[in-house]
Amino acid sequence: TLEDSIAFARLLKQEGIGLAVMGEIPLVVINVQRGGPSTGQPTKVEQGDMLTAIFGSHGDAPKVVIAPATIEDCFYSVITARKIAETFNMVVVVLTDTSLASSQQAFPRPQFSEAWLAPPIDQSEIPPGLKPYDWDAKTGLARRFIPGQPGGMHTLTGLAHDRLSHVAYDPDSNELGIRARSHKLAALQQTLKTPTVFGGDKGDLLVIGWGSTKGAIEEAVEKLRAEGRKVSSLHLTFLQPMAPGIKEIMQQFKKVITIEGNWSDDPKDEIIDESNRRYSALATLLRSRYLIDVDCWSEVRGAPIKPATIQRVVLEKLKQK
């Protein structure tokens, strides 16, 4: 199933997304971010939906979140998302934004590859005794039962259920299901490649970004490096789960900062201090996951962040002790 939605409309569909998580129904959701909250700025650029995409829905609802950086990335990200959704029986959110949605880019005509496809669905008769949610103890994966499949009759429900798909409210069944759905994220994470650093592998400052800010960040980093600054950048495509090796990359730099199009408090404001400062979305994730002091700078002016602005911000951060 493929669902395409602007950010505001997607919030109205959280119950359906939660059903897909609980029932382990493959689903790709394309979320085109724009200014919010509420009606906000319908035609303006913003990156305010990351945390909603990852944590949205009541209860524990693990989802994969991919953020393409270019028009070409958008094409291939949907292919990747569908393959992951069908391989792991999960919800995959493709998190794009108004900047990409309203842009045009020429790229080489794609040549079809068998690698794009998920493994074919096994539609053979279900062997006696095989359970519809026969979760693997390590990966959480289970064979997908298809409606109408011989021997595959089962209940598809948003209620907590056991391995037989029967509604079950007992503590053991509920915890077993949650563990299985969570382990699928870990199983996917182990297949991901460590992202490539743009610039040197170590230095004074690492800029981390996601989504459509990639071009502006790399242009700024390239100019700063031409001036002799020991600055590099890292752009993340997988936001949930995050690829392996990110912590080790960050540890090679004296300072780490995220550049994003969502809100973060300015520490220069009189009322803001370290006890009440709100960090940007990606900085919040990185700080909590890797326990590294990640700083952030963000802009929510309804327009793409400019390379010159990023250069200025990075130079200011380099001067700070």
Regions found by a protein language model. Give the residues of each.
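Flexible, low-complexity linker and terminal segments
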Residues: S77, R82-K321
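Short glycine-enriched loop/turn motifs at secondary-structure junctions
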Residues: G59-D60, D201
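Short, conserved catalytic or adaptor-binding loops enriched in Gly and charged residues
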Residues: T52-G59, L286-Y290
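Thiamine diphosphate
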Residues: T1-F55, V64-E86, A226
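Conserved beta-strand scaffold positions in the cores of enzyme catalytic domains, especially
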Residues: L27-V29, K63-V65, S233, V294-W297
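Generic structural motif recognizing short loop/turn segments at the entrances and edges of beta-strands
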Residues: L2, E46-D49, P62, G152, ...
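A broadly conserved detector of short glycine/acidic/proline-rich loop/turn motifs that flank catalytic sites
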Residues: N31-R34, S57, T70, T98-S99, ...
